[in-house]
A protein has these predicted regions:
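Local cysteine-cluster metal-coordination motifs and their immediate loop/turn environment
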Residues: 56-61, 80-106
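Generic secondary-structure boundary signal with a strong preference for alpha-helix termini
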Residues: 66, 98-102, 117
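FNR/FR-type flavoprotein reductase catalytic core
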Residues: 1-83
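Short microdomains enriched in Cys/His and/or Lys/Arg
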Residues: 107-118
Length: 118
């Protein structure tokens, strides 16, 4: 089931990809993304902002495709990593650059690095 699809369609141009083709494009979201970006003019590409959210492999793959067409400052990502305290004290969600997902995120520019093992 795809949650909030109708709500998203009210505020954005929505393109859906499902692995099994049960809704929208059949295949990986990165394939749909690349096809859509290839259709756009330079002016359209320059005005895009991406908000990636989901499992690490998908977010990193999407950001990689986006970087082929757009600048890093247009790409923001949130990855589902474990957070413990939620207020930045324990450091469980700290990435190698010191950013803490619980207080500096959840969306960070580019593709956030995996938190360091504690």
């Amino acid at each position: 089931r795809l949650y909030y699809l109708e709500e998203c369609k009210k505020i954005a141009d929505v393109h859906v990809a499902t692995d099994d083709g049960s809704e929208g494009y059949k295949g990986f979201v990165t394939e749909l993304l690349r096809n859509r970006l290839l259709e756009m003019s330079r002016a359209e590409l320059d005005n895009l902002v991406f908000y990636n959210c989901g499992p690490s492999p998908m977010v990193h793959a999407a950001a990689k495709v986006q970087r082929e067409f757009c600048r890093d400052d247009q790409i923001f990502s949130a990855i589902d990593y474990l957070t413990k305290c939620g207020v930045g004290i324990c450091g469980a969600c700290a990435s190698p650059d010191g950013k803490r997902i619980c207080v500096d995120g959840p969306f960070m520019q580019g593709s956030p690095e995996r938190p360091a093992a504690n």
